[in-house]
């Protein structure tokens, strides 16, 4: 197995940084769209281990990447808890009966029953990890982010229902978050048992919170998960809070080994605020791939020059969030080729 990605979490400064791309197995690739067309709905595809493996392999077959990520979705846990999940074109994920009260929370399945409904994810991890020659990243949504969808019923611009519950009924909110955290610990450990070499916690909506509420309603539960996972097995864990650059000083002392960085700050700024010891992952603006070949190469060169100037810390080159569906696959090749060229 190529171990450059895992070596980034070691103490030795690497000669060159590893690279992978968030949502690297996705709609921007025509081969992904061909597989997706075979299934009536998205979750049916996620439940098919062979299909998950096939689409996880697509970017590895196209590009020189140092890691793969299991093909799945962050909302597998809420669905396993008994919530009715549908993916609606033009809207995205929708829960038909959002959590609004203690009664709704009481309807959810137990942790044991919920975990038993997630075997298809572990099968996808096992099938994929046994096929590839690079590390496989497992993942989950943060409890706060999962709760956002479970309470709102779908994505939202303002998340009024979510934030209302946080302020008006914090006890109920914490009850939901704790249950999600307890399930997530087992979920991640099972992914590791199945073959994941690293796990990532995607805190997509943590960035909407004020600092104190981020600490109490989001980071607290990510840290709880990380500590409990590491008590069982010492595996690299990456925290990524989208829009979370204001929280770096809080994250830097937590149990994660890596921190995802979006494009709202430079890597230099992020390193200054996080300090030494943690791997930084990111932080290209996904939209930079709309640019010309020359502009892509210039942006890559600037980041690689900074990474190489830091003699103490390692970095994982990535986008600051998932790749957009309408990105030209050839632009991705330009980016990766430039990363390899300027890192040589």
Swiss-Prot record:
Matching SUPFAM superfamilies: UROD/MetE-like
Xref: Pfam families: URO-D
Catalytically driven reaction(s): uroporphyrinogen III + 4 H(+) = coproporphyrinogen III + 4 CO2
Any one cellular-component term (Gene Ontology): cytosol
Chain positions of site Transition state stabilizer: 73
Positions that bind substrate: 23-27, 73, 149, 204, 321
EC number annotated for this UniProt entry: 4.1.1.37
Enzyme class: lyase
Keyword Cytoplasm among UniProt keywords: yes
InterPro entries referenced in this protein's UniProt entry, alphabetically: UROD/MetE-like_sf, Uroporphyrinogen_deCO2ase_HemE, Uroporphyrinogen_deCOase
Alphabetized GO MF terms: uroporphyrinogen decarboxylase activity
Keyword Metal-binding: no
Pathway(s) the chain acts in: Porphyrin-containing compound metabolism; protoporphyrin-IX biosynthesis; coproporphyrinogen-III from 5-aminolevulinate: step 4/4
CDD domains: URO-D (cd00717)
One example of a Gene Ontology biological process annotation: protoporphyrinogen IX biosynthetic process
Assigned keywords, A-Z: Cytoplasm, Decarboxylase, Lyase, Porphyrin biosynthesis
Localization, UniProt: Cytoplasm
Assembly: Homodimer.
Primary role: Catalyzes the decarboxylation of four acetate groups of uroporphyrinogen-III to yield coproporphyrinogen-III.
Membership in a protein family: Belongs to the uroporphyrinogen decarboxylase family.
Protein name (record): Uroporphyrinogen decarboxylase
Lineage of source species: Bacteria, Pseudomonadati, Pseudomonadota, Gammaproteobacteria, Thiotrichales
């Amino acid at each position: 197995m190529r171990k450059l990605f895992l070596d980034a979490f070691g103490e030795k400064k690497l000669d060159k940084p590893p690279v992978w791309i968030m949502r690297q197995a996705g709609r921007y690739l025509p081969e992904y769209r061909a597989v997706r067309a075979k299934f009536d709905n998205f979750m049916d595809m996620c439940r098919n281990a062979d299909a998950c493996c096939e689409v996880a392999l697509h970017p590895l077959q196209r590009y020189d990447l140092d890691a793969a990520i299991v093909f799945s979705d962050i909302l597998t846990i809420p669905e396993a808890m008994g919530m009715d999940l549908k993916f609606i074109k033009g809207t995205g994920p929708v829960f038909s009966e959002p959590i609004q009260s203690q009664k709704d929370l009481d309807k959810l399945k137990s942790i044991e029953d919920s975990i038993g409904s997630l075997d298809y994810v572990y099968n996808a991890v096992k099938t994929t990890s046994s096929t590839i020659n690079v590390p496989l990243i497992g993942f989950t949504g943060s409890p706060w982010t999962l709760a956002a969808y479970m309470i709102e019923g779908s994505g939202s611009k303002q998340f009024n229902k979510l934030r209302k519950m946080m302020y008006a009924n914090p006890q109920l909110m914490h009850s939901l978050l704790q249950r999600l955290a307890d399930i997530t610990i087992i979920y991640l450990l099972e992914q590791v048992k199945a073959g994941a070499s690293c796990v990532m916690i995607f805190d997509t909506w943590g960035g909407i919170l004020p600092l104190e509420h981020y600490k109490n309603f989001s980071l607290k539960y990510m840290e709880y998960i990380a500590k409990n996972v590491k008590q069982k097995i010492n595996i690299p864990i990456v925290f990524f809070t989208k829009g979370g650059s204001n929280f770096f000083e809080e994250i830097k002392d937590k149990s994660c080994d890596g921190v995802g960085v979006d494009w709202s700050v430079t890597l230099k700024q992020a390193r200054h605020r996080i300090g030494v010891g943690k791997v930084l992952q990111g932080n290209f603006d996904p939209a930079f791939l709309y640019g010309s070949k020359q502009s892509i190469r210039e942006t890559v060169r600037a980041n690689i020059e900074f990474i190489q100037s830091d003699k103490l810390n390692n970095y994982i080159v990535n986008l600051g969030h998932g790749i957009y569906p309408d990105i030209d696959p050839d632009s991705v090749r330009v980016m990766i080729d430039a990363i390899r060229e300027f890192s040589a």
